[in-house]
């Protein structure tokens, strides 16, 4: 018997179909590479920005200072957020440097574990927001890992400035039972860290006068916003 050649319409001949496929794949690859080059060449336009919250033992990340500060960070383009959580139940920390140091060591180990998978070099801008003993944890973590970040320290402890936090701004109340305001202020000056002091405010930057405390919170957040908006050093 004689074989008859199968006639394909030009658009669907096997060879033509293969050519179309190659052209489409090539076009997709070229487009993808172009997008990657565009994003790579515009890192200043589309920077990777990360904010990390280091809470205190009893002051979690949804309490006012950390809640509103990270909201401000999100408005400033920090679209990657990490919220740390601690587990610590021992009492008797206040007034006991040894107990406080033990708590710090425990919380620092927990922070190390929670941040172990972070690829720090991929971020163009890193901001640490911290509260109370979390200010010492954040300062130690940045120092030990050489992370070029900025830090906002809410109600820091004396221990915090022994860890030399860099590129930082601090807030403290003069009636804070966890910190001696004068010694912390001196340590902040020696470290080159601006410290905003609030008269008669406690460890939560509150006085008991609700309207006054709301005004204080607004002032703290305005200063926080200004610091966040500054170009990273």
Features from the language model and the residues they span:
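Serine-hydrolase catalytic machinery in alpha/beta-hydrolase-like enzymes
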Residues: 48-122
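Gly/Ala-rich beta-loop-alpha elbow adjacent to hydrolase catalytic centers
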Residues: 129-138
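A conserved short beta-strand
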Residues: 147-156
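Short beta-strand/loop motif that positions the catalytic acidic residue
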Residues: 170-172, 176
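Conserved alpha/beta-hydrolase "acid-adjacent" motif
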Residues: 177-183
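Catalytic histidine-centered segment of alpha/beta-hydrolase-like enzymes
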Residues: 201-215
């Amino acid at each position: 018997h004689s074989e008859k050649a199968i006639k394909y319409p030009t658009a669907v001949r096997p060879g033509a179909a293969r050519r179309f496929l190659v052209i489409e794949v090539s076009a997709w690859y070229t487009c993808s590479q172009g997008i990657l080059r565009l994003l790579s060449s515009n890192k200043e336009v589309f920077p990777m920005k990360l904010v990390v919250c280091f809470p205190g033992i009893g002051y979690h990340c949804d309490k006012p200072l950390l809640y509103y500060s990270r909201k401000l960070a999100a408005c400033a383009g920090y679209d990657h957020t990490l919220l740390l959580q601690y587990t610590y139940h021992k009492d008797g920390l206040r007034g006991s440097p040894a107990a406080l140091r033990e708590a710090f060591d425990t919380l620092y180990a927990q922070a190390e574990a929670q941040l172990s998978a972070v690829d720090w070099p991929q971020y163009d801008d890193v901001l640490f927001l911290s509260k109370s003993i979390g200010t010492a944890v954040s300062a130690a973590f940045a120092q030990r890992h050489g992370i070029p970040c900025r830090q906002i320290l809410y109600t820091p402890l004396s221990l915090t400035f022994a860890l030399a936090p860099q590129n930082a701004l601090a807030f403290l109340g003069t009636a804070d039972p966890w910190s001696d305001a004068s010694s912390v202020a001196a340590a902040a000056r020696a470290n080159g860290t601006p410290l905003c002091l609030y008269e008669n405010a406690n460890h939560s930057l509150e006085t008991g006068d609700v309207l006054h405390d709301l005004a204080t919170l607004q002032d703290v957040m305005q200063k926080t916003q200004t610091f966040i908006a500054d170009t990273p050093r």
